[in-house]
C-alpha cells in the first residue's frame, strides 16, 4: 500500500512513519516542509531513510501540495501536520492558515484534482483540545474537522477522524507535561505546576500508533470519528507524582506553584467501546508500564 504521512517530523507522526516503513507491505512517503532540505530529520526517520520517500511541500500552498500528492499517488493518507501544538500564544492568522487552510488544501489535492486514482481513505488526526477550544490551535483544528465532516457528508469523500487523547512517550517535546516532569524528575529537580486537579485520559505512544494503523486498515464510513485512549481518567497531580515515583531521583512536584487555566475541561475519557467495535483495537499498555518505559528510554538516551 502507498501511504502518505503529513507531519511525520512531529511526535506522533515520526513514530507512525517509522513503524509503517518497517513493514514490507507498504511504500511510505512523508510530506515535510522545505526547511528539512537543510536540516536533519528526526533520528527515528533517518534510521528508516532507505525505506522512506521524502516529498517537500507547504500545505498552505495548494499547487505544491497537489504536486506532492500526485507524485505519491497514495492509497492512504495520514494527516498529522499542524502548527502551534505546544504554543498557547499562536497567532490566530497563523493557526487558520496552517491548520484550516492547510487541511483544506490537502483534502482538495487528495480528492478533487484529476489523478489515476484517489486515496481510499484520508485519516485526519484530531486533538482532544477541540472539545473545549481554549486556544487558536484547538479552535482551528476543530474548524478543520468540521470541513472534513462536511466533505464526507456532502461528497462522500472517505475521510475519517482519529482523536488520540493525552499521548506521552519517547520523542515528545519537554514543553509537554509528562516529558517535562520526567526530565525534571530524572535530574532530581522540583517541578512547578498547577494544583493538578484536572483529570485526563493518558495513553502511551505505542498504543496510539497501533490505533492509527488499525484505523488505516479498517473500512470506515465517511465522517467516522474514532477516539484513542484508555477510557480511564487520572489527574495531572497523580501523573506527576507517579513520574517521580518511577524515577526515584529526588525532587518532587510543587503543586499550586502555577495558576490553573480558566475554563479548562476537567474530565473527559475516550470512548473505548466505539474504538473496539469499529477497528478492533484497545490500548494495552498500562500507565505504570508506560511511564516505566519512558523513564528507561530517557535514561538510555542520557547514557
Description of each model-found segment:
Residues 1-76:
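N-terminal Rossmann/SDR dinucleotide-binding element
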Residues 23, 287-303:
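Amphipathic terminal alpha-helices
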Residues 117-127, 147-170:
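Conserved beta-loop-beta element that borders a ligand/cofactor-binding pocket
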Residues 142, 167-179, 189, 205-206, ...:
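Glycine/proline-rich active-site loop of Rossmann-fold NAD(P)-dependent oxidoreductases
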Residues 205, 237, 258-282, 286-289, ...:
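Conserved C-terminal active-site "lid" loop/helix of NAD(P)H-dependent oxidoreductases
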Amino acid at each position: 500500500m502507498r501511504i502518505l504521512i503529513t507531519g511525520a517530523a512531529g511526535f506522533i507522526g515520526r513514530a507512525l512513519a517509522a513503524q509503517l516503513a518497517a513493514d514490507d507491505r507498504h511504500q511510505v512517503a512523508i510530506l515535510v516542509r522545505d526547511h528539512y532540505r537543510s536540516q536533519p530529520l528526526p533520528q527515528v526517520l533517518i534510521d528508516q531513510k532507505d525505506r522512506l520517500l521524502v516529498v517537500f511541500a507547504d500545505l498552505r500552498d495548494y499547487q505544491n501540495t497537489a504536486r506532492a500528492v500526485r507524485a505519491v499517488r497514495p492509497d492512504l493518507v495520514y494527516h498529522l501536520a499542524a502548527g502551534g501544538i505546544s504554543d498557547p500564544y499562536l497567532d490566530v492568522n497563523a493557526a487558520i492558515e496552517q491548520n484550516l487552510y492547510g487541511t483544506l488544501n490537502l483534502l482538495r489535492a487528495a480528492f478533487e484534482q484529476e489523478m489515476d486514482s484517489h486515496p481510499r481513505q484520508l485519516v485526519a488526526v484530531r486533538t482532544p483540545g477541540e472539545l473545549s477550544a481554549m486556544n487558536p490551535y484547538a479552535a482551528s483544528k476543530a474548524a478543520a474537522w468540521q470541513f472534513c465532516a462536511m466533505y464526507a457528508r456532502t461528497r462522500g469523500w472517505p475521510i475519517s477522524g482519529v482523536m488520540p487523547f493525552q499521548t506521552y512517550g519517547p520523542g515528545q517535546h519537554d514543553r509537554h507535561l509528562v516529558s517535562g516532569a520526567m526530565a525534571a524528575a530524572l535530574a532530581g529537580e522540583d517541578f512547578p505546576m498547577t494544583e493538578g486537579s484536572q483529570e485526563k485520559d493518558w495513553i502511551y505512544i505505542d498504543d496510539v500508533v497501533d490505533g492509527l494503523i488499525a484505523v488505516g486498515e479498517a473500512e470506515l464510513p465517511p465522517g467516522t470519528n474514532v477516539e484513542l485512549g484508555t477510557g480511564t481518567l487520572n489527574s495531572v497531580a497523580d501523573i506527576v507524582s507517579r513520574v517521580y515515583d518511577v524515577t526515584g531521583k529526588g525532587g518532587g512536584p510543587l503543586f499550586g506553584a502555577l495558576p490553573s487555566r480558566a475554563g479548562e475541561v476537567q474530565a473527559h475519557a475516550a470512548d473505548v467501546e466505539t474504538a473496539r467495535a469499529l477497528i478492533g483495537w484497545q490500548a494495552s499498555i498500562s500507565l505504570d508500564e508506560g511511564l516505566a518505559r519512558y523513564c528507561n528510554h530517557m535514561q538510555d538516551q542520557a547514557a
